[in-house]
Amino acid sequence: MQVNKALIRDDSVKNMNKSSAPLSSQVVPLILLTGIFFLNFISRIILAPLMPTIENDLGIGHGEAGALFFLISLGYFAALMGSGFFSYHLTHRKTIILSSMVSGAALFAISISHTMWGIRLGLLIVGMAAGIYLPSGLSTLTSLVRSRDWGKAIAIHEMAPNFGFVVAPLLSEILLIWFSWRYILILLGVVSVSSGLAFACFGRGGKFPGEYPRPGILRVLMVDPSFWIMVALFSLGIGASIGIYSILPLYLVAERGMLRSWANYLVAISRISVLGIAFLSGVVTDRLGPKVAMGGVFLGTGLATFLLGVVPQSWIVLIVFLQPMMAACFFPPGFSALSRIGPPRVRNISLSFTYPLAFLLGGGAIPAGIGALGEMGFFDLGISLVGGIVMSGLILLHYLQLPEE
């Protein structure tokens, strides 16, 4: 066991891929990776703004429509946990290209399918294609850029999903003026395939294999306290961002008495401010280190989330804008810390197991718990409790051990 652990932890940051370089020299591959991640993310959420049109066109109800989102999530998390098998046999670079190509092909297949089973299968494949990207994308990114610039590089990469939240509804509304939802999926599929070809021609890095979850590696991870601490920290980070985002419109309408249209508009525009603040978090991460940066994030996010449940009505709009800005700051230091656990070859394993487990807790259990308290008449208490739980991340950080930079 000690030999295996030494293998996994051996100079995780110092023995970086020889291509590691300053961030300024890796702008083109970083932009390509961020663009692929953006398309990867938007392909999973584009159905949300298109769904009213899709329901009318296919003659399905809300329940069946909701099941379509479940299929995307099922494919995503299954592929994410098994992504190591792809990167082990193909290398990270080819896995990224495969993700873009298959996602684009699946979107095209959905657009021409006229049976529900064909659409369901296509959405499952879209989720799976998206799921194999993230571990390989981050492994490639951290192999290209020197460790002192990881925070900024990851912050740029993490702009993709935040930008996707803003672009998806706007893009859908604009294109629906001229095209049906099927042509929108075709367009997105073509752009996705094109991004894969662009990375194949102009992208760099990732020319090394990942590791698949072999019993020996899994055994080392499962007994490593840092792995479980990172699962807990990511659960808190995801819970404060996606978890609160999922339940916030309902809270604003049911507990704060807002009109539904105003609540949805407020939540949507509050995401715009997140785009720039994440990069600032990356700069702080590079200057102070991921542990210090995460400490500030958990304190600020926990306090903002707590206030979301207790401030008077006159302050609620300000807090709705402040809370996601603080929550988005978690991911640059969070992924930077996670990327320091293990050498480049095995980093994808920690990510492919940390993120799904954390999402189930932060993105599933936390909003479900808030909703349950809301049913009992304690909606505001549920929100504030999450704020207190997020601040407990400060205690966990004390026990997190990261390799020296």
Regions found by a protein language model. Give the residues of each.
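Cytoplasmic helix-loop-helix junction between adjacent transmembrane helices
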Residues: G122-A160
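Extracytoplasmic gate region of multi-pass secondary transporters
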Residues: L47-A48, S226-V274
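Helix-loop-helix hairpin linking two adjacent transmembrane segments in secondary transporters
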Residues: H157-A200
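Juxtamembrane intracellular "pre-TM" segments in multi-pass secondary transporters
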Residues: N15-L23, G205-M230
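Helix-to-loop junctions at the C-terminal end of transmembrane segments
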Residues: A79-T91, A278-G289, G374
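C-terminal transmembrane helical hairpin of 12-TM major facilitator-type secondary transporters
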Residues: K291-G334
